[in-house]
């Protein structure tokens, strides 16, 4: 689920997944929820149906309960996947962009950086998060125009702020 402020993004994901036949086509509705501190929150959510194929995907991403980077991730890191990653876990930092990769090892983050470089000519660096053994990817400002050109068709208007003045 997402906070109500991300309504547009969640509806985009729903439409994408529903069109693939993996969830109900009924459009999710904004709901009210009371948080632990008594604050009223607006949320929106939907669920996918259960398929055996999802178990195979899960096996590629989790080994003994630990999240890992699949060896063939480069085959799946399409412009659409990159856009979703940014809308989910990206953030504008200065003139560049941060991608949250906290749960991956340093070697896995290096692998992702190499894929971004080889596949898309997107230059990036590794930033420590401040937590032990946690790292983020920082896409350099010089590569932002290249990135935006690839992902622009998929970025919902309410998420364009993550790309700064490049979009």
Q: Where in this protein do the model-derived segments appear?
A:
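Internal intein/HINT superfamily modules and their associated LAGLIDADG
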Residues: 1-167
């Amino acid at each position: 689920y997402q906070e109500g402020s991300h309504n547009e993004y969640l509806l985009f994901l729903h439409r994408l997944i529903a069109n693939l036949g993996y969830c109900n086509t009924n459009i999710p509705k904004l709901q009210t929820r009371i948080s632990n501190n008594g604050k009223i929150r607006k949320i929106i959510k939907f669920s996918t149906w259960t398929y055996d194929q999802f178990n195979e995907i899960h096996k590629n991403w989790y080994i003994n309960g630990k999240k890992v980077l699949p060896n063939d991730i480069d085959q799946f890191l399409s412009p659409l996947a990159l856009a979703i990653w940014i809308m989910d876990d990206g953030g504008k930092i200065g003139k560049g962009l941060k991608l949250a990769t906290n749960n991956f090892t340093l070697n896995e983050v290096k692998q992702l950086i190499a894929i971004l470089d080889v596949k898309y000519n997107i230059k990036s660096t590794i930033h420590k998060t401040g937590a032990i053994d946690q790292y983020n990817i920082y896409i350099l400002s010089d590569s932002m125009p290249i990135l935006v050109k690839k992902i622009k068709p998929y970025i919902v208007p309410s998420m364009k702020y993550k790309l700064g003045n490049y979009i």
